[in-house]
Amino acid sequence: LHDIINLNEFATYANMKVNPGEEKYYPQANGEMRYVYGENLDSYKADPTNPANYRVINYVDWQKEAYSSALSQIYSASVSGGSDAVQYYVSANFKNIKGIVENTGIKQGDLRLNLTANLSKAVKLTLNMNGSLQQNDMMTGGNTTGGVAGSLARTVLDTAPYRTPSDDPSLLDNMDAKTNVDSWKNDYDDIINDKKFNASADLLWKINKHFSYNLRAGGGVSVNDRNRWYGMTLTIGANDEGVLAVSNTDKSNYSIENILNYNVDLTKKIHLDATAGLTYDVHTFLNKNVKGTRFSNFDLRTKGLHLASIIKHDQPTQKDYQLLSYLGRVNLSAYDKYLLTASLRADGSSKFK
């Protein structure tokens, strides 16, 4: 943590910045710090004993209010076994990682399955599947403009080391004056729900001593939902009477590869291997963004989009493509010294392992 000035040091600094007679901070012999609004300065100087003319403020270390030690928990279990014909591996994991900022953290569960099966002496099948569910409750990462309106980290460093009295007139004129660490902790949500699933299969068929066939298929699905809420004690939320930004991103892909391999020794010193294949890839991407403002009720926060008076739907972003590719390659090696290669690629998408 940074070495932050205390309340007395801040009062001395703030009083030095203004003209004589306009000081707002008055430390007392008993350790009390009095804060005087600009319009009450004359009244306070005339009667400094009248509590109506000042407010007592207390020192707040915003770093300690914002950050604290966090506990992380990780649990995992796995099972493996099988026989000569079939082998399997199953694992499960759960993570509960608390953030150093209150009400932030990650919860994630994962499940994985690996299976290998010898269907015959010539055919082998390998399956891999995994999925995960994740909820990430984050704190804002800031923006390029800085200042207390941008992020908690800047608010911690830029805010005066005390809580501004609620009846301070400056709160009416300066929106940023309302924003402190409490605002970010209690009036901001950034929740991401992420779902992922991936699967692949690899079938190898050794047709004879020269030919082998490989079929690979795999794909994945990803669903990402993000909801950000700015309440009335944050500048962004106060400007629009509450702001809820909702983002949904859906991605998926799958691919199929058919590979035929040929290997032969033409002589004791000359070897030939050839590959021919066909691949097909499909990718989809869709992103939707919705923004709600002018809320009539603030209690539902990230779940209250229907309470917004103004709902703006941005133009969705969609990126889909399919690719069909052909490939071929021939390698001729001689005497373990010379190599001649010829290859054919269609669409520039061929891949060799």
Regions found by a protein language model. Name each.
Residues 1-58, 69, 99-106, 110-198, ...:
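Surface-exposed loop/interface segments of Gram-negative outer-membrane beta-barrel transport/assembly proteins
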Residues 76, 255, 323-328, 337-339:
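Short glycine-rich loop/turn motifs
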Residues 76, 87-91, 118, 124-128, ...:
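Membrane-spanning beta-strand positions in outer-membrane beta-barrel proteins
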Residues 1, 60, 85-92:
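Transmembrane beta-strand segments of Gram-negative outer membrane beta-barrel proteins
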Residues 66-70, 76-83:
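Outer-membrane beta-barrel initiation region
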Residues 95-97:
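Ligand-site clamp/hinge motif
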Residues 203, 328-334, 338-344, 349-353:
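Conserved catalytic-core segments centered on acid/base and nucleophilic motifs
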Residues 72, 83-84, 120-122, 206-208, ...:
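Outer-membrane beta-barrel channels and translocator barrels
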